[in-house]
């Protein structure tokens, strides 16, 4: 039944930015193993996987890619950028929506492009640096009693 559901959804044509091979939609179990918390999810995986370790998670409802394909180093950098943005939200008491609007302005990107899953290594570095700077300013303001 699951196979029928997968084939009935739109098929996205994605090419690996690292080796140029076609990406294929696979169960997360095939990449992460059966005991993953992503067990019911799907990924677009480079057809040269595992020698090319590029993949991107797919949305559950329609299997749209959640960003661009990334190798292990870029996926790690995106995780760090997400963590930095979460720390920024916590330090500045900002909700997720407002933090992305802030990020749009800081990066000079539009709403469609302001998703960490679409960011390059350099953009992730900028997010991390911007968040650290704002967290430091917020901390200084709290210490001085400025809100």
Predicted segments, located by residue:
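Non-catalytic, well-ordered alpha-helical scaffold segments
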Residues: 40, 97-101, 125
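Extended interfacial segments that mediate partner engagement and assembly in macromolecular machines
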Residues: 61-97
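Chromatin/DNA-recognition segments of nuclear transcriptional regulators
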Residues: 113-133
